[in-house]
């Protein structure tokens, strides 16, 4: 499902998927631990389910479960006082200025239950932040608008201003903030 970690340094631990995953689960998540001169840093990378639409019988519940499993997993790591970086295609635009599509499109997406900035999705993202993870982009650019996804069919990347969403994120624990 497109999840990988590349590093010059060999990890001391690798977990593919969540420990609670069933044998037939999609492995959309990888966790590696690195030793940097006695400082352990856990790097978690995911290709989060897109969810399609809140009415979809399998994709939306899969996204909800993924976020619940991830939040539980992070809380377990936090209980061990782990330094963490969580990154990936999270498929959620958490704030209004992370949305770079027309107001009419926003209204249509919300009315139709299209995923990316539904209220419940934003709650799932906020649950990650509530574990004391911080949005690195927002730490550097509090009011900035940078988009990471563009619909290739409508060529939103060709327009000025560009049309898309910020759905790719890097979150980290506060003890790593000086590394930004």
Report the location of each language-model feature:
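Structured beta-strand-rich core segments of catalytic domains in phosphoester-bond hydrolases
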Residues: 1-55
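Surface-exposed cleft-lining segments at the edges of enzyme active sites
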Residues: 19-20, 48-67, 108-113
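Long, contiguous hydrophobic alpha-helical segments, chiefly transmembrane helices and signal peptides
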Residues: 3, 29, 46-49, 63-66, ...
């Amino acid at each position: 499902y497109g999840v990988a970690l590349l590093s010059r340094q060999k990890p001391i631990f690798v977990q593919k998927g969540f420990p609670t995953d069933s044998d037939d689960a999609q492995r959309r998540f990888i966790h590696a631990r690195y030793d940097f001169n006695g400082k352990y840093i856990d790097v978690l990378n995911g290709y989060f389910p897109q969810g399609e639409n809140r009415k979809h019988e399998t994709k939306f519940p899969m996204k909800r479960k993924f976020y619940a499993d991830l939040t539980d997993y992070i809380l377990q790591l936090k209980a061990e006082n782990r330094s963490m970086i969580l990154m990936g295609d999270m498929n959620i635009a958490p704030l209004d200025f992370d949305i770079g599509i027309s107001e009419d499109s926003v209204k249509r997406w919300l009315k139709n239950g299209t995923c990316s900035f539904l209220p419940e999705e934003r709650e799932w993202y906020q649950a990650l932040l509530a574990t004391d993870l911080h949005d690195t982009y927002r730490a550097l650019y509090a009011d900035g608008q940078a988009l990471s996804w563009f619909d290739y069919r409508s060529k939103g990347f060709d327009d000025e201003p560009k049309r898309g969403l910020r759905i790719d994120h890097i979150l980290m624990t506060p003890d790593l903030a000086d590394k930004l």
